[in-house]
Amino acid sequence: MSTQPEISDSGAPVGALLFLRCGKDADFAEIHSSLLAQDGVTASIPVFGEWNILLRLAAKDRENLQRFIEERIRSCKGVESFQAHYCEETWPVSGAAADGEHKAAACALLDVDTGGFTALVARFRAMAGVSEIIASDGGKKIILFLRGNSSREIRNVFGDEVRPLAGVLRIKLFNTMN
């Protein structure tokens, strides 16, 4: 498997992650459930922080993803703003973080130096707590999914293992509701 991110022209399904911010008076539960019921939505994950919902999308091609975003997300009542990240390559990680029950989960959006991209992916694949790695934005961003026994455990992974890595420029960590 290549570690250089590329958009596939193979006809294989393509994906995107959308971070959504809901308006102050929006019915969060209604937005969450109505989006989850849409064709092409593979997950709707409530998150804490700058954004309220992390939406995973899949479509047959990038054009259909873009159409979904334009037609369904922009017109969704209660969604104030969003940020889209197209999945260019995904590395599922096997092991304890990917298997079994965990009490805490998080997602992190990392700005990374593209020169060290391959080395970063290799380090993340070996890191305890990382359950999935997604490349986006031409290798300038990596989205990590983590699982652990507590939010503190996940924060410690970031403070002790991720933040000090050469090539990690900025981290935004979002705890998810289990």
Language-model segments: residues:
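A compositional/biophysical signature of low hydrophobicity enriched in polar/charged and small residues
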Residues: M1-N178
